[in-house]
Amino acid sequence: MKHPLQEMMDKRREGIRCGIPSYCSANELVIEIALRRAKERNIPVLIEATANQVNQFGGYTGMKPADFYQMVLKMASAIGLPENMMILAGDHLGPLTWQKLPESEAMENSVELVYQYARAGFTKIHLDTSMKVADDPEGLLQTEVIARRGAKLYKAAMKGYEELKAEKPDAMRPVFVIGSEVPIPGGATEAEDTLAVT
């Protein structure tokens, strides 16, 4: 089965304009409204969680990735939205949350983070290794370092997915967003007076 985001990309290549909003919230009311909208319009719903909101230590919501997934799934079931209409995503997953730690610790946490997101069933994984950690040298982070860290996280995510697939053969393979060509986590750091499509 093809991922709904890949289906949309195929349509766009054919000149068919389409898209869906992304809801980056752990607020149950926001999630419920998003799920209801998806059911009413018969479109997939994309709900994103950040590493600060949801992680292996509970994040500020107190939820691990599997907890968040099950919460959304339970809400979707109550509304009557099938699981295959849900796209759960991890946003800016990587060492950002652990920037004050040295690379070995920050990456150990990051590997476990992306593993748990994929293992829980999240199917859109944004890997972002562009942020420095405590023992990175001054200046720009080298492309080789960013790529090495990203490859390590991709491998961890795929391990989580393969374990999920062994238990749930119809589990959808995740799609990946790599890098940080999107606004930085939390939004821009300077005033903006225009909107850039990313």
Give the positions of each predicted feature.
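Hydrophobic faces of well-ordered beta-strands that scaffold small-molecule active sites
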Residues: 19-24, 45-49, 84-92, 123-129, ...
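Alpha/beta catalytic barrel-like cores
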Residues: 1-86, 193
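Low-complexity, flexible helical/coil segments
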Residues: 57-61, 80-88, 123-129, 159-164
